[in-house]
Amino acid sequence: MKKKLVLFGLIFRVTIFSLTGCSISKNKVTGDAFKNQMTAANFTVVDGKSQFERYDYISEVYLARHKEYGYQVEFYVLKDKEYAKSFYSNNKNLFESSKTKTYTEAKSSGKNYDKFVLETNNKYKVLTRVENTVLYINIDSKYKEKVNKVIKNLGY
């Protein structure tokens, strides 16, 4: 009887945690806000839209390169949420295909976002979709702590 109560309590907590996790939402960042925040954080931001002109579902692209360390953070604004979900899914699959024997990964999702983090083969990869925007990061693991501060400041 005691084991059943403990098991029920555990299942109840997991269920509540799962349900509340799905109701969490994030505020999306606009292209202008991304440029401003990244510039203030010592990044050089360039408009990368010309590299994606043939993709009509991509509205805006900004590439932010850290002035001192040289790693890059990419920000995409897509036509709508469905395109962003597809873009996220395709890039997540690419990240997953790069897994080596030793890796760590984390996934989370909420009402309007999905996030995937993978560390493998000395690379740190982060993909976050919030509504119709996607933050894409594929850098050397040595910059992990620095880029996590950037991600946190963006709210992604």
Can you say where each PLM-predicted feature lies in the sequence?
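Positively charged n-region of N-terminal signal peptides that target proteins for export
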Residues: M1-L5
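Sec-dependent N-terminal signal peptides
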Residues: V6-R13
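C-terminal motif of bacterial Sec signal peptides marking the signal peptidase cleavage site
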Residues: L19-G21
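Bacterial signal peptide processing site
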Residues: S23-S25
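Short Gly/Thr-rich strand-loop-strand
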Residues: N36-R54, A84-E131, I151-Y156
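Secretory pathway targeting signatures of secreted, lumenal, and periplasmic proteins
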Residues: T44-Y76
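A short acidic-to-branched-hydrophobic micro-motif
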Residues: H66-Y88, I137
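Short, exposed beta-strand-loop hairpins at the edges of beta-sheets
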Residues: K125-Y143
